[in-house]
Amino acid sequence: MNNWNSITIKISREAEETISALLIEAGSAGVEINDSADYLNHEDQFGEVLPEIEQSELVEITAYYPENMPIVELKAEIEHKIANLADYFSLTGLSVTTNNLSETNWAEAWKKYFEPARITHDLTIVPSWTKDYLATGSEKLIRLDPGMAFGTGTHPTTKMSLYALEQVLRGGETLLDVGTGSGVLSVAATYLGAAEIFAYDIDEVAVRVALENIELNPGHEKIHVSANNLLEGIDKKADVIVANILADILVLMTDDAFRLVKEEGYLIMSGIIADKADMVIASAENAGFFLETRMIQGEWNCLIFKKTENREGVIGG
C-alpha cells in the first residue's frame, strides 16, 4: 500500500484558486478544499448531520503528494511562494501544515466533502456511495468514486471541460480522453452522444479507478481504457480529443493531437492556469489548430481548438 504526504494551507478565501493552482503546479496528486461557507450555505437534501461551525474568512486547502517527494523542502518552497503573494492577498491567519496518511485513509477522506453536484444543465456528478439520489427531468447522473485518481469532477477545469464537450459533441463521434483520471469526461461523453471513446492515462492507479467508475455508469461498453503516455504511439483518428491536465504537459501533445484529429474536428484543452494560456495557444496554433473558444473561470482557462481550413468565426480568423 502506498503512503502519501499532505500539505494543508489555511488562507483567506480570496486566495483559494491561486493557492490551488500553486499546489497543483508543485506536483500535487489532488486538492481538496474545506470552506465553512459551504456548510453554512448547504441545504440538507441528503439527511446528513452537519457539524456546528462558525463562518470564517479562511479556507483550508489540502494537497496530496507521493511519499517519495521531499515534503520538508516542498513545504518550504510553497511557503516562500505564498509569501510573495502578500501584495495580492491577505496572509492574516495563514498556516501551513503537513501530514502523512495511507492510501486507504486518503480515499476515505474524499468522502467527507464529496456530495452530488449539478455541473451543467443536464449533468450531475453523484458519489457512488450516495444510493438515494435520483435523476429528475433531463438530468443525467455520472456516478463516481474518485478513489486515488485525484478528482471528483467538480473542479473548475473539469466543469469547463464538460461545458466544452456539450458544445462540440453532436452524436456519433469518436473521442480520445487524454489523462482520463477518474474517467468523468469519458462517462459524460457517452451521455452526450459519443459513439466510441478511448481513454488514456499514464498512471496505472488512475486507469484502474477510471475502469471502476466507468462500470458504475450506463454506456460503459463504449469506453476503452488503457495506460499510455499522452498520445504517443496512438493511431486512432478522432473527431474530438479532450485533455484536462497541466499546461506544461498539454504542449507536449499538440502535434500528435493535430495528427489524430479529423478535419473539422476539435481539440479541447483544460487545466491551464492563466499565465500559461498563451503558451498553450501558441503550441496548438503552431501545430495547425485554430482557437475557436476560450473559457475562463477564476485562474483557469479551457480552450477549444478546431482543425479546419475555414477560419470564419474562429478567434483571430
Curated annotation (Swiss-Prot):
One of its GO terms (biological process) is methylation. GO terms for molecular function: protein-lysine N-methyltransferase activity. One of its GO terms (cellular component) is cytoplasm. It comes from the Bacteria. InterPro entries: Ribosomal_L11_MeTrfase_PrmA, Ribosomal_PrmA_MeTrfase, SAM-dependent_MTases_sf. Its EC number is 2.1.1.-. Pfam families: PrmA. Belongs to the methyltransferase superfamily. PrmA family. This is Ribosomal protein L11 methyltransferase. It comes from Lactococcus lactis subsp. cremoris (strain MG1363).
